[in-house]
């Protein structure tokens, strides 16, 4: 599977890291389904920029299975082919600001449930919607976006980190289940990225602290992170599944 003309779904693809992922795939010639929940204006502006023959703005709440199925059907009707690459990037609104996070003392089950719904249930809904088309095509790539925080919780975002750790477990069990159909499932785990919507509230001293802890001496960019998604979407990764690749400049070595 080469990326050119491949139908790629990026959930949460209109802003933040998702926008960089959508752009990266479009630059390689893919046809991109830019999913969004509430960022209608940004999604349509991005699609207009990428070209309406190459991109489709698709509103859906990924936590709603029926909305996801409808979105996948619309994408197939629009492009005339099934989605064969799905990037589960959508995130419940979250600000990476350690000063504003709930400490363990104040963490609630509702905090955990909200993040679990976005990260795990959302990814499950997407996988269930796209895998029939992938099986029909004889191949597919599912790429889940994780975090290095469950290996190195430099800031203890309890709810977000726990949900992403659960997503890693689902990544590996799904890889086992879907492998016979020619579908690979992998995770890319970044650290702090400079800069996305989610990290916009991060103080400069935190960026400096993270950069000082990496062999490269800098914070990873969204563009560098997106490059790894291109690898997992291509034939270069055809022998790789069930893996978690950390892209954080070497802050975590695992």
Whereabouts are the PLM-identified features?
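Conserved glycine-rich cofactor-binding loop
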Residues: 7, 14-15
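The beta1-alpha1 cofactor-binding region of Rossmann-like NAD(H)/NADP(H)-dependent oxidoreductases
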Residues: 40, 59-72, 109, 223
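A glycine/serine/threonine-rich, flexible loop-to-helix segment
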Residues: 46, 100, 159, 180, ...
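Catalytic loop of short-chain dehydrogenase/reductase
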Residues: 92-96, 103-115, 141-166, 171-180, ...
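A short, exposed helix-loop element centered on a Lys and neighboring polar residues
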Residues: 127-128, 172
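Alpha-helical segment proximal to the catalytic Tyr-Lys
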Residues: 132, 176-177, 238
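Short, small/polar-rich loop/turn modules that mediate ligand/substrate recognition or access, typified
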Residues: 179, 184, 240-242, 248
């Amino acid at each position: 599977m080469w990326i050119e003309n491949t139908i790629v779904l990026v959930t949460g693809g209109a802003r933040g890291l998702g926008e960089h992922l959508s752009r990266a795939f479009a630059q390689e010639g893919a046809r991109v389904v830019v999913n969004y929940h509430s960022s209608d204006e940004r999604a349509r502006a991005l699609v207009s920029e990428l070209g309406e023959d190459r991109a489709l703005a698709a509103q859906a709440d990924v936590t709603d299975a029926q909305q996801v199925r409808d979105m996948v059907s619309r994408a197939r009707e629009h492009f005339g082919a099934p989605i064969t690459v799905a990037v589960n990037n959508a995130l419940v609104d979250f600000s990476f600001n350690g000063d504003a996070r709930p400490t363990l003392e104040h963490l609630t089950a509702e905090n955990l449930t909200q993040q679990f719904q976005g990260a795990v249930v959302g990814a499950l809904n997407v996988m269930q919607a796209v895998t029939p088309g992938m099986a029909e095509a004889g191949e597919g790539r599912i790429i889940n976006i994780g975090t290095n925080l469950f290996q190195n919780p430099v800031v203890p975002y309890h709810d977000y980190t726990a949900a992403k750790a659960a997503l890693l477990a689902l990544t590996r069990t799904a890889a086992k289940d879907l492998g016979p159909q020619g579908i690979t499932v992998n995770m890319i785990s970044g650290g702090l990225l400079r800069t996305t919507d989610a990290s916009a509230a991060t103080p400069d001293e935190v960026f400096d602290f993270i950069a000082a802890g990496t062999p490269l001496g800098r914070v990873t960019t969204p563009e560098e992170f997106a490059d790894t998604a291109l690898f997992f979407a291509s034939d270069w990764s055809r022998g790789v599944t069930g893996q978690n690749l950390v892209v954080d400049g070497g802050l975590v070595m695992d």
